[in-house]
Structure formats: structure tokens, C-alpha cells
Amino acid sequence: MIKQAIEKVVNHENLTFEESEAVLDEIMNGEAYEVQTASLLTALTAKNPTIDEIAGAAASMRSHALAFPETKDVLEIVGTGGDHANTFNISTTSAIVVAATGTQVAKHGNRAASSKSGAADVLEALGLDINETPAVSYESLQENNLAFLFAQEYHKSMKYVAPVRKQLGFRTIFNILGPLANPAHPTHQLLGVYDETLLEPLANVLKKLGVTNAMVVHGRDGLDEMTTADETAVVELQDDHLTKYTVTPEQFGLKRRQRADLVGGTPEANANITRRILAGDHGPQRDIVLLNAGAALHVAHPDLSIQAGIDLAAKTIDDGKAFEELNRLLAFSDKRKDVVA
């Protein structure tokens, strides 16, 4: 299959959803030579992958992932990474705030690739066990409204792709597949992307993968987040319909900040930023978390406007519930460590 797929893509022909899924199955099963995988990834990058090619590849990644118990109405807050902005962990902090409102969040993430601190790094620095089994993570989702799914634990088949990606050294389709391959199969998703041209294609991919409500966002300062340093371009998926619009921090009563105000550091430094935000500190870092948490709450509860989501996120922090959520997660993690020990 992979030989035919390479030939098609080299000739600038598009693969169908089924063909893309099948060829990724071949790669994920270790049946393709590295040179074939490299050829396919290079050709896809040169051609630009289509919605069907991305969705088919994501479906294959999902099917090869470690199984996660079935969920209903679960939210994911995630970015593609690759913006090289070295911000603190905005999505992860926002996920904790959203979980504290009673909204279930299945956070799928990894260690840092293009930054100093990925979701796994900062959660580990906060004191959480990032290597929990699917059963334990599901239990956390039910008890604490938040589960972390460590990508490298769930996607063992990526071992067939990792060396090729490293040797190629440029962005490939896999740079956008991670956020689309959450084993919890979220129905609602706030997805940040590193390039504005990805907004509409990835919104359509999410739709194809069964996501019912989503916002795909790109900060025009380059962030793969909703940003307070510039406008944010948005494509929203709701009721099978896509809407494009732009938002500014000012329209939500937030100050426009400098991107330098949002820069983080090591996992330990970022963990301290997260703790301070959850504890109620005000400033630029809180504001961008409020914006992203507010957008995520709108995605999870479409009747709630982004502004109402921001207000709820602020109240959740100011009432101490967000910090309580972190403490619950830590207590749960410690309890499970004791059980294992």
C-alpha cells in the first residue's frame, strides 16, 4: 500500500480518507521501511496534506493507541506546539481551571518538543504522576474532572516514526496529528495552531473525527493559543457549521499585553506560575488563562458565551476552587502512588 501511496502523492494526487488510514496503519504496524516513511512524509509536506489525509492518519493513530475507557461529553484543550514562543503552560493551567468548574477535561500531551516545558513536564513538576494507567486516569476524570493522558505511553507505535521525523528535521503531518489523536476521543475541543492557514482545515478534520463543538485558534502574534498580545483568529465548529471570526482581548475587558509577559521557563518555573495563577495572583499570566479557559468553557457549554466563560473562570479562581482542584489532583495522585507502592 505504501508504495502506491507514495507514487500518488509524489504525482500530487490526494489520498482518500481510507487510503491515508491504511497507509498509516502500515507504518504504525512497523511494516514500512524507514525510507518509505520518509518518502511519504516528505511528499505529503511538499503537496500539503488534505482534510481526508489528515483525518485518515489521525484515525489510524487513534486506533493504534492504548485504549481509554469510553467517555461522554469530554473536553480537550491543546495546542499543536511549534510556535517557538516559550510561553508558560497556558493550556494546562487553563485545563485545571476549567476542571474546577465541574467540566470534564481529558488532557492529552507530551514532554516539550519546541519549548522548554510541555504539559507532561509541568504536571510532573507540580507533583502529579504522569504515567497513570488508563483505568486510573479515567478514575481521575470521574473524581476530579481532569485526566492526563501521556502521549508517549498511549502511542507506542510512534516508535516506528520517531527516528524518521528526527532525521528529516522539518515539520510533517505528524506535527498536527498529536492534538487530533487523543485516546479519550473528546467531543469538544479548543485547539490552538501554529499557522493561521491550518484553522479551517483542522476544524473540518475535527468534524470528520466526530467532534461536535470546537474552536480552532491562532494568535496573530504567533501563539498556538488565544492571545492577549494581539488579535486571535478563530474558526468555530458548532452544529456541523463553521464560523470564522476574530477576537481581541479588549472586547472581553482584558488588557492587551506584551508577548514577553507570557514567557515561561523551566518546568519548575512554569509550575510556580501555574500555582500562583490558581492561587489568585493577578496580571498578564492570569489574563491569558482566563481568555483560554473562557473559550474552552464556551466550547464545552455552547450556551455559555466566551465572556460568560471568562467570568466563570475568574470566579472559580477567586473563590479558591481552582487551587482546590490542584490539591485534589495531587492528593489523588499521591493516593494512587501509595496503592502501587
Swiss-Prot record:
Positions annotated to bind anthranilate 1 = G79, N110
Tell me the route in metabolism or biology where this protein functions: Amino-acid biosynthesis; L-tryptophan biosynthesis; L-tryptophan from chorismate: step 2/5
- Keyword Hydrolase present in the record's keywords: the answer is no
- Kindly list the cofactors needed: Mg(2+)
Judged by the first EC level, this protein's enzyme class is transferase
- Binding of 5-phospho-alpha-D-ribose 1-diphosphate: at which residues? 79, 82-83, 87, 89-92, 107-115, 119
Task: Provide a Gene Ontology MF annotation, just one.
Answer: anthranilate phosphoribosyltransferase activity
Q: Where Mg(2+) 2 is bound, by residue?
A: D224, E225
- Keyword tags: Amino-acid biosynthesis, Aromatic amino acid biosynthesis, Glycosyltransferase, Magnesium, Metal-binding, Transferase, Tryptophan biosynthesis
Name any Gene Ontology BP term: L-tryptophan biosynthetic process
Q: Which E.C. number(s) belong to this protein?
A: 2.4.2.18
Binding site residues for Mg(2+) 1:
S91, E225
One of this protein's Pfam families, by short name? Glycos_trans_3N
Disulfide-bonded cysteines: none
Q: How is the cofactor bound?
A: Binds 2 magnesium ions per monomer.
Q: Which residues bind anthranilate 2?
A: R165
- Give the domain of life: Bacteria
The regions listed as transmembrane in this protein's record are: none
> What Gene Ontology cellular-component terms does the record carry?
cytosol
Reactions catalysed, semicolon-separated, are: N-(5-phospho-beta-D-ribosyl)anthranilate + diphosphate = 5-phospho-alpha-D-ribose 1-diphosphate + anthranilate
Please explain the role this protein plays, according to its UniProt record.
Catalyzes the transfer of the phosphoribosyl group of 5-phosphorylribose-1-pyrophosphate (PRPP) to anthranilate to yield N-(5'-phosphoribosyl)-anthranilate (PRA).
- Family per record: Belongs to the anthranilate phosphoribosyltransferase family.
Subunit structure as annotated in this protein's UniProt entry: Homodimer.
Entry protein name:
Anthranilate phosphoribosyltransferase
Q: Which organism is it from?
A: Lacticaseibacillus casei (strain BL23)
From the UniProt record, report the name of the gene that encodes this protein.
Answer: trpD
